A protein has these predicted regions:
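Core catalytic lobe of class I
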Residues: 1-170
Length: 170
C-alpha cells in the first residue's frame, strides 16, 4: 500500500529517500527492488542501540535508501535531480574517463586513474553528521543532514513530502 500511494504522487525521475537499519533496510529495499538504486550511510557521532550493547554491536551508522522513479543511467542523467557538492568540475572526470580511466569496452587502461580517485570533490556514500543536541525524539535526524538530502534531490521551490516525519524535523 505504501509503494502504491508513493508511485501515485511521485514525479517522473523523482526520489524517495528513507532511513532504516538492518534487517528492516533489506526488507524495505526488496519491497520495491525495481525502484531501489543505492544507499547512503549516515555515520553518527553517537552510537545507538545502547540497551542491547551486551548482545549486539552499538550502531554508529544508519542506512539511507534511495529509490528513484526513473532509470539510473548516464543517458538519463539530465532528467534526474542530483545536486551533489562537487568541488571540482565535471571536466576533470571527463578527462579521466577519456584519457586515463577506461577503454571503449569499459575496462580500465591501467592504474593511472588512481591519482584522481578520491580527489574529484564528488561525495562518497558516507555522510557524517552529528546527532542534534536539542532533539525531541531519540531517533530524530539532524536538521543539517535533512537539508543536505533535500537540496540534493530537489530543485528550488519543489514540494517535499515527509510521510514519516516523526517529530517534524523536516
Amino acid at each position: 500500500l505504501m509503494w502504491e500511494q508513493l508511485n501515485r504522487i511521485i514525479k517522473p525521475n523523482g526520489a524517495i529517500v528513507l532511513f532504516g537499519s538492518e534487517p528492516f533496510s533489506s526488507h524495505l529495499r526488496m519491497s520495491n527492488i525495481s525502484m531501489y538504486k543505492y544507499d547512503w550511510i549516515w555515520h553518527k557521532n553517537k552510537s545507538g542501540n545502547v540497551f542491547l550493547y551486551k548482545i549486539s554491536p552499538m550502531k554508529r551508522t544508519e542506512n539511507i535508501m534511495v529509490f528513484l522513479n526513473g532509470v539510473l543511467t548516464p543517458q538519463n542523467e539530465p532528467n534526474i535531480t542530483f545536486n551533489h557538492n562537487a568541488k571540482k568540475s565535471d571536466k576533470l572526470m571527463k578527462t579521466v574517463m577519456k584519457n586515463e580511466g577506461v577503454q571503449n569496452n569499459g575496462k580500465r587502461k591501467d592504474d593511472s586513474y588512481k591519482k584522481y580517485y578520491g580527489n574529484t570533490g564528488y561525495e562518497d556514500n558516507v555522510l557524517r553528521y552529528d546527532v542534534d543536541k536539542n532533539r525531541i525524539h531519540p531517533t530524530q535526524k539532524p536538521i543539517e543532514l535533512l537539508k543536505h538530502l533535500v537540496k540534493m534531490y530537489t530543485n528550488e521551490n519543489e514540494t517535499v513530502l515527509d510521510f514519516t516525519m516523526g517529530s517534524g524535523t523536516t
